[in-house]
A protein has these predicted regions:
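N-terminal secretory signal peptides that target proteins for export/translocation
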Residues: 1-4
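Noncatalytic, solvent-exposed loop/strand surfaces
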Residues: 22-432
């Protein structure tokens, strides 16, 4: 199962600003770089302007053929794009220049193909600190490469820790702290969080993260989020029906919250990742089917287990299963699995407006991007919708068809938008 990026969940006080809440190391990068699955603020948003208002042939700058089916989201560092894909049965990291030409590719061992029809062995998105690129694959490979493609180090997590017991293929992406690359394994059986030295790959710490849940509830495809609380670098993790906040120095949790599925419904893995707006964590859970998914508003305050006090609101009529929400101007924007679009107030959970995209048999797996007054939302069949962002109403700006399946999430690359399809990487810029 895919995410994208997905996955991903990174203690914050009520007074903590959104800007200071996110602390991802970007040592050699620029503010316009897209260093991880959900971008600079880890919430699917960008302040870049001059972006295309539609993703049509008129705005298409180039498209590059990819070597194989991968569902990860690309990242960008300076003028280069990095993505993962299978190439002739090998897990591979690709580097692409700003014109759509391949600069280099690095094979990292045998691919383990995906199980879901929309999955792959390259579900997890790469991540960068501006100095190197870190990538993980279903095969168990976790690797760090320099920006020129030189392998810094490579590990086999399956050989070292065993295979993850999951119904679908892993979707959790690695995340970076100041010193470490963090991997979260949230699965049936032995689950854990581990930190590896960014320079050497040496294990810094590893902590168990095991919770008893109904069937499949212990399986997570989300991606952690790295945040800062009062100067303490921490990792917000969602999965196995619990939010936890380990610190990055030794993995010990300073805050936690359970109590999400009191009805003990089975077959509810965690797929969409939470988003953070000031001290509120908005957590999607449950499948978007007749059992109805739930959206939770959790206030991050205090220390220790805050299950009894953290739950502020709950919506049983509006949530998402696979696509992770995005954030703009302290508002939550959701593109749900069946094309429902909703703008919400994270403090109260109240709907500001709601509407629907054109009905289709195809679902949304990609997580939306909000930038330059637009929401970009690809559907799995390759149809991409652009929606004008408004505090008052829904307005569909454009509908375009890429002609191939789209699972990865769109990103901003300079003043362009990149969308990864099943066969190609597409680059769009504002029409002149």
């Amino acid at each position: 199962m895919v995410l994208k990026n997905v996955f991903t969940l990174a203690v914050v006080t009520a007074a903590l600003s959104l800007q200071s809440a996110f602390a991802q190391t970007e040592t050699a990068s620029t503010s316009s770089d897209w260093l991880n699955w959900r971008g600079p603020d880890q919430n699917g948003s960008s302040t870049q302007t001059g972006l295309p208002q539609a993703l049509s042939p008129k705005e298409l700058q180039w498209k590059m053929e990819l070597p194989g089916k991968g569902c990860s989201t690309p990242i960008s560092v300076a003028d280069s794009v990095y993505l993962t894909a299978p190439d002739q049965g090998k897990d591979t990291i690709l580097c692409i220049d700003g014109t759509g030409k391949k600069k280099w590719s690095r094979s990292l061992g045998k691919e383990s193909p995906g199980r879901h029809r929309n999955g792959s062995g390259s579900n997890a998105s790469p991540v960068s600190d501006g100095q190197g690129v870190f990538a993980s694959f279903k095969s168990g490979t976790l690797a760090a490469v320099e920006l020129d493609g030189t392998i810094r180090w490579q590990l086999d997590l399956v050989k070292e820790y065993g295979k993850a017991s999951m119904f679908w293929s892993e979707g959790t992406s690695p995340v970076l702290t100041e010193k470490h690359v963090i991997m979260a394994r949230i699965c049936a059986g032995e689950s854990w969080l581990a930190a590896f030295d960014k320079q050497t790959g040496k294990l810094a710490w590893k902590v168990d993260r095991n919770y008893k849940t109904p069937k499949e509830g212990d399986q997570g495809y989300t991606t952690p989020m790295v945040i800062d609380r009062d100067g303490v670098e921490s990792i917000l993790v969602w999965g196995a029906e619990h939010l936890t906040l380990p610190n990055t120095s030794d993995g010990q949790a300073s805050w936690a919250c359970g109590g999400f599925h009191l009805k003990k419904v089975g077959l509810w893995p965690a797929v969409a990742s939470p988003v953070l707006v000031e001290d509120m964590i908005v957590v999607p859970s449950g499948r978007n089917d007749k059992r109805k998914p739930i959206l939770h508003g959790i206030k991050m305050a205090g220390e220790g287990d805050q299950t009894e006090t953290a739950h502020q609101w709950k919506r049983e009529d509006a949530s998402t299963f696979v696509p992770t929400p995005c954030v703009r101007d302290k508002k939550i924007y959701m593109v749900r699995d069946k094309g429902e679009v909703e703008c919400l107030d994270p403090k109260t959970g109240e709907t500001i407006w709601a509407d629907k995209l054109p009905k289709s048999r195809s679902n949304f797996y990609s997580s939306p991007l909000v930038a330059d007054g637009m929401i970009y939302a690809p559907r799995e069949d390759g149809v991409v919708f652009t929606i004008k962002v408004s505090d008052e109403k829904f307005e569909l700006a454009a509908t375009n068809d890429l002609g191939e399946s789209t699972i990865g999430s769109p990103i901003v690359f300079g003043n362009q938008v990149l969308v990864r399809g099943q066969k190609h990487l597409f680059c769009f810029a504002a029409a002149k």
